[in-house]
């Protein structure tokens, strides 16, 4: 039996500005992955998606999932748009090199011109110089459940897509999307747990666990698979 043990790699950029009230997660997937995405959503948040969106008090890194595209840390929410803007101004956010995006959620019928106008309204509530090309921080607004929401937007890390071009692969290896989902479902998003892949093959699941910040060990009875897993990692 050959064992492959990975090291735990973690990194974070922490910007403490606002305390979130809750989090809005936006999902995207191919139609044949809908049930798989709902399974993951139940494991991570305790609920299934509603129109590819989950609103939750549970904080998760978007990159843990192959389906989560971004997480909005909602700091201001109000049904009245003018009061919503006043609340943002009251925060007194002062910084340079920011940008404001508009998240289009299913059911939002605002046209492009209206969305641009909303972005500008919110941008004028922030004291500082925007940077549309290389922002240091991204804010976003959206309209969900008859309420306007504002907060810091965290996007997925798409580097995991490169793992489809691993040095070694078997014809019966599971796909990268399935591997990434298995990690999030098995762990329920808790990076403190240690995972075990008892038949790791070329290390597809292990690689996705490592890049998401999990500790994982793997083993395989096939020496060829063992060496290929090491090279892939």
Model feature map: region roles:
Residues 1-2, 9-130:
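Non-catalytic nucleic-acid substrate-recognition regions in nucleic-acid-modifying enzymes
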Residues 20, 136-138, 147:
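Broad gene-expression machinery/nucleic-acid interaction feature
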Residues 101, 140-142, 151, 213:
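Residues in well-ordered beta-strands of folded domains
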Residues 112, 116, 135, 172-176:
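Short, amphipathic alpha-helical segments
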Residues 130-140, 195-199:
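Short, surface-exposed recognition loops or helix-turn segments adjacent to catalytic cores
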Residues 174-233:
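Conserved S-adenosyl-L-methionine
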């Amino acid at each position: 039996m050959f064992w492959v043990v990975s090291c735990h790699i973690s990194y974070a950029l922490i910007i403490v500005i606002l305390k979130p009230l809750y989090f809005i997660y936006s999902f995207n997937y191919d139609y044949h992955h809908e049930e798989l995405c709902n399974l993951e959503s139940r494991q991570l948040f305790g609920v299934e998606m509603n129109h590819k969106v989950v609103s939750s008090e549970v904080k998760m890194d978007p990159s843990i999932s192959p389906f989560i595209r971004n997480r909005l840390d909602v700091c201001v929410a109000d049904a009245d748009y003018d009061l919503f803007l006043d609340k943002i101004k009251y925060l007194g956010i002062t910084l340079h090199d920011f940008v404001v995006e508009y998240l289009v959620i299913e059911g939002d019928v605002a046209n492009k011109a209206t969305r641009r106008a909303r972005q500008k309204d919110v941008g004028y509530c922030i004291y500082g110089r925007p940077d549309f090309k290389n922002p240091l921080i991204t804010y976003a607004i959206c309209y969900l459940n008859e309420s306007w929401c504002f907060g810091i937007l965290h996007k997925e890390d798409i580097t995991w897509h490169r793992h489809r071009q691993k040095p070694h692969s078997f014809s019966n290896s599971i796909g990268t999307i399935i591997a990434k989902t298995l990690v999030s479902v098995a762990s329920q998003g808790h990076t403190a747990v240690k995972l075990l892949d008892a038949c790791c093959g070329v290390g597809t699941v292990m690689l996705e666990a490592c890049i998401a910040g999990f500790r994982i060990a793997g083993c395989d009875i096939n020496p060829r698979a063992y060496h290929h897993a090491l090279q892939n990692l």
